[in-house]
Amino acid sequence: MEFSSPSREECPKPSGRVNIMAGSLTGLLLLQAVSWASGARPCIPKSFGYSSVVCVCNATYCDSLDPLTFPALGTFSRYESTRSGRRMELSTGTIQANHTGTGLLLTLQPEQKFQKVKGFGGAMTDAAALNILALSPPAQNLLLKSYFSEEGIGYNIIRVPMASCDFSIRTYTYADTPDDFQLHNFSLPEEDTKLKIPLIHRALQLARRPVSLLASPWTSPTWLKTNGAVNGKGSLKGQPGDIYHQTWARYFVKFLDAYAEHKLQFWAVTAENEPSAGLLSGYPFQCLGFTPEHQRDFIARDLGPTLANSTHHNVRLLMLDDQRLLLPHWAKVVLTDPEAAKYVHGIAVHWYLDFLAPAKATLGETHHLFPNTMLFASEACVGSKFWEQSVRLGSWDRGMQYSHSIITNLLYHVVGWTDWNLALNPEGGPNWVRNFVDSPIIVDITKDTFYKQPMFYHLGHFSKFIPEGSQRVGLVASQKNDLDTVALMHPDGSAVVVVLNRSSKDVPLTIKDPAVGFLETISPGYSIHTYLWRRQ
C-alpha cells in the first residue's frame, strides 16, 4: 500500500536539533539527552510522487555515511530513516541507570545465542553491470562506494549469475558448441570479462570488509537439455552419473577456474537457480528443471564429488535456491540421503512466494530438522508480480517489505540476505523477456544520475551495522506490539538492535540491556532505526 507523497518541506535538510526533534513532542521528551551528529554528506531528496523520496547522486555528489564507530561506554548511537525523508541520520544518547519510561520494554537476552551472520549484498547481473558502466567513471565510483565502502552500507556478498539470465540482453552459456562434452570450447564472454569481473574487482577494492562471491547457474547449454532450449520445460538429458550430468558438473569447475584466472575466488555456488522453474511448461526465461530427487542424485553422484575432487573443494554448495514454500520437503529429500548431504553446506531461499509460506512452517521447521545446515536468503526484489508496477521511485512501502523480510529471516535462523540486481534503469531493466522489476538503485543514464531508493537504506540498516560473524541473541518484548525487532552481538560483544515500525503510530519504547542499563527512545510511525552500544 502506498501513502501520500511527502512535500519538499518534509525532506531532510542539514538542520539543527530543534528542527529534527520538532516532529514529535514525545520524541522531544524521550530523546532530550540525544545530541544530533552532523557528519557525512546528507541526502539530496527528490519526490517522484510515491510515498517517500529518493536520494539523488551524480558524478560530483552522493550522500554518504561516516565509517562505523561505536559510541563511548554508557552512550548509544541511533541511526534513523523515516518515510518523511530522513536517511540513516545519526544521533547519540545516554544510557540510563534506571527505567523511567512507561511504554514498551525490549529486554536484551545475550545468553540466548542463535545463528552467526554471513552477511548482506546484491547481484552483479549483466543488467546491473550495464547500468553501472553506462554512468561516467566518477558516478560509477560513487555508486560502488555507496554499496561497498565504509562510507556506504558495507555490502559483503555479491551474487554472480553463471552466464545469462533474464537480466541479460541476449541468451548465452559458456559452452554453446554442441556436444562439446570435454568443454574444450568453454569460455567467458565479454559480459564477464568486460562488465562483471572488472566491476567486482572495483567493489572488492572499495570494501573494507572481506566480500564473499556466490555463483548460480540459470541454464545449462541447450545440447545438454531434454528440450534443447534455454527456457521452457526442460531438464538435463539422461540420468545422474551419466555423461550429461558429469559434463554439467564439470561446467561448474570450469567456471570457477575461469574466474580464478581473473583472480576471483568464490565462497559458494548454488546447485541451480530456481530448479522448480524448469518443470513448468512455457517458462519464459533461462531455467533448468530439477525435482528434489533429481537434485539429490545430481549432487550425490556428480556435482558434489566433482567439486570435492577439484581445486575448488573449499567452495560451499547450497541446495534449493528457490522459494521457501518448497521447504521442508526439498530439505528432507536431499539431506536425508547421506551421499548428498555430505556435500551440502546450506539451503538457499528466494522470497517471491513468502506470502504463501509462513516462515515458521518452512524456515523454522527446516532448521528444527537440520540444525547444522545453514539457511541463506539468496534473492529478493519487488515489482516482479504481474499486478505490481515495476519501478516505484521513492516507495517507502517497498523499503519496509525489505526490512520486514530481513528481520523475519533473521528470527528464523537465516544467516544472510541477498538482494537481486544492484542497479537497474528507470524501466526496471534491461531484461530480454521484459521481466522488469525494481532495484535499490535506479540509474538514469540520460542525466548521468542514479537514485538511491528507500530499499537501499532499509538494507543499509542491517548491512552496515551487522558484520560477518555477528550473532543473533534474544530480545523479549514486555507486551504485544506492532514493531519488528531483532538483536545481535558483534564479534567484539557490542550490541545492535534494529527496530522497524510499519504502522502510522509513534511507539515510545525502552531497550533494556542488563549489563549497562536502559535506552529510552521512540519509534516514529513508518520508520526504521538501528541502535548500537558497547557492553564493556
UniProtKB/Swiss-Prot annotation:
GO cellular component: endoplasmic reticulum; Golgi apparatus; lysosomal membrane; lysosome; trans-Golgi network
Pathway in which the depicted protein is active: Steroid metabolism; cholesterol metabolism; Sphingolipid metabolism
A Pfam family: Glyco_hydro_30
GO molecular function, one term: galactosylceramidase activity
Keyword Lipoprotein: no
Biological process (GO), any one: lipid glycosylation
Disulfide bridge positions per record: C43-C55, C57-C62
Swiss-Prot/TrEMBL keywords: Cholesterol metabolism, Disulfide bond, Glycoprotein, Glycosidase, Glycosyltransferase, Hydrolase, Lipid metabolism, Lysosome, Membrane, Signal, Sphingolipid metabolism, Steroid metabolism, Sterol metabolism, Transferase
E.C. code: 3.2.1.45, 2.4.1.-, 3.2.1.-, 3.2.1.46
Membrane topology, from the record: Peripheral membrane protein
Subcellular localization(s) per the UniProt record: Lysosome membrane
Catalytic activity: a beta-D-glucosyl-(1<->1')-N-acylsphing-4-enine + H2O = an N-acylsphing-4-enine + D-glucose; a beta-D-galactosyl-(1<->1')-N-acylsphing-4-enine + H2O = an N-acylsphing-4-enine + D-galactose; cholesteryl 3-beta-D-glucoside + H2O = cholesterol + D-glucose; a beta-D-glucosyl-(1<->1')-N-acylsphing-4-enine + cholesterol = cholesteryl 3-beta-D-glucoside + an N-acylsphing-4-enine
Family of this protein: Belongs to the glycosyl hydrolase 30 family.
Subunit structure: Interacts with saposin-C. Interacts with SCARB2. Interacts with TCP1. Interacts with GRN; this interaction prevents aggregation of GBA1-SCARB2 complex via interaction with HSPA1A upon stress.
Protein's recorded name: Lysosomal acid glucosylceramidase
